[in-house]
Amino acid sequence: MKKLLLLVCAAVMSLSASAQAGDKALGAQLVFGSKTNSIGLGVKGQYYFTDQIRGEASFDYFFKNQGISMWDINANVHYLFDVADKFKVYPVAGLGYTNWSYTNDVIVIEENGNKRTTEFKGSNGRLAVNLGGGAEYALTDNVSVNAEAKWQIVNNYNQLVLGVGVAYKF
């Protein structure tokens, strides 16, 4: 399995193209949410409107921690600044929708003194404003790695989301 993964990575990295208006990219990311205190996985799609401006749609799922799981879907815009050969930084601005699901066991003490456990479930969804920044390093003309930090501003549930990922440009 490891040999197959290395072969696929080598094949992908050997392809070449340049980033310009109309280009697209697909990627995956590992994320961490400060409010949920959990890690998650995400997928993203990018479209280059110009050589410097790209839009990004992403979906992240944060694994359950202490009875809470979360997912978000985002639409962000990046303005790419060339800092050095193959290295770019960018601000992040956009909108998102976040959804939290929670499951907790609650111990109920009845009037007669008996105890019973009841499961308490629920979910909440809210719109978010995303603000942050990131950095990207091109491993090849098509493959890049990135690190990003964004603040999800959500009514009563602001969260810092940190992510690292890889993207393939085509």
For the regions a protein language model found, what residue spans apply to each?
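Cleavable N-terminal export/targeting peptides
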Residues: 1-23
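Outer-membrane pore/translocation modules
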Residues: 20-37, 98-125, 163
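A cross-taxa feature marking solvent-exposed loop/turn segments within ectodomains of secreted
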Residues: 21, 36-38, 50, 84, ...
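Residues that define the transmembrane beta-barrel architecture of outer-membrane proteins
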Residues: 22-24, 37-41, 69-73, 87, ...
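Transmembrane beta-strand segments that form the barrel wall of outer-membrane beta-barrel proteins
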Residues: 22-35, 54-64, 144-154
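Membrane-embedded beta-strand positions of outer-membrane beta-barrel proteins
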Residues: 26-30, 43, 55-57, 75, ...
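Gram-negative (and chloroplast) outer-membrane scaffold detector with strong preference
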Residues: 46-112, 122, 126, 137-141, ...
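A generic hydrophobic-segment detector
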Residues: 115, 125-170
